[in-house]
Amino acid sequence: MTIIKENSPHLRRKANVTRMMMDVLIALAPTLIFSCVVYPVNTIVNLVISLAIMIGAEFVFIGLKNMYPKDDVKRTFKDKFEHSYKGNFTINNILTPAISAVIFTLIMPAGAPIYAVIIGALVGIVIGKLVFGGLGSNIFNPAAVGMLFAKLCFGSQYVTYVPTWYYSIPDAAAGATPLGLINGGSLANITQYPLLDMFLGRIPGTLGEVYKSTIIIGLV
C-alpha cells in the first residue's frame, strides 16, 4: 500500500477542494449581491481591495515558497517564473483567498475606512494563513483574523455605519449592533429593533451580519 502525504482536506468522495470552494462562493453570493445593491460603492471598493491584497499575497507567497535556491546558475526570468508557479499556483490558490476576501468584506461595516480594509486584509491573509504554510495548513480563519485586527486598531471607525436608501434612520450612523447589545448582557436592549427589520437587515451592523433573509437563501 502506498501512503501519500498531502495537506488537508482529505476526501474519499467525488467532491474536491475546488468544488467545495465554489459551493462556499455560491452560498455567499446572495448576501454579497444584496450588499452591493444597498451599499454599491462601499461594498465594491472594499471587495476589490480585499481581493487584490489577498490573492496578490497568495501569489507572492507561492513564488517565494517555490523559488530556486541560491546558486551560481544563471537562469532567465521565464525559467524562474515557471519553476515557481507552474503546477504550484492553481485555481485553488485563487479561490481560497477570494473566499477569504468575500467573507472579510462581509464582516466589515460599509463605513470602514479604506486604510482599515487594506491593513485588515493584509494582516488576515499573512498572519492568519500564509505564516502557517498556506492552503490547508492554516489554523485560523484569515477573514476573522483581519477583522479582529482592524477592530482592535480602528475601533471607533469600526462602529460607524452608513445610512442608505434601505436603512435611513438617523441614529444608524454609529452605535452598537443588535449582536453587540446582546453581548452586553441584556436581551431587552434589542427590543428597539422590530423582528421584521432584523430579518430584512434594516438595522446597523456589518455587511454580512444584518441580512438574515439572504443568509438563509445562501444556506439553502
Feature map (PLM): residue ranges:
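N-terminal signal-anchor module of multipass membrane proteins
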Residues: 1-59
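Short, amphipathic, aromatic/basic-enriched membrane-interface segments that mark the entry/exit
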Residues: 11-21, 62-67, 82-92, 108-112, ...
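C-terminal ends of transmembrane helices
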Residues: 56-72, 79-82, 125-136, 217-220
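Long hydrophobic alpha-helical segments that form multi-pass transmembrane helix bundles
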Residues: 136, 142-216
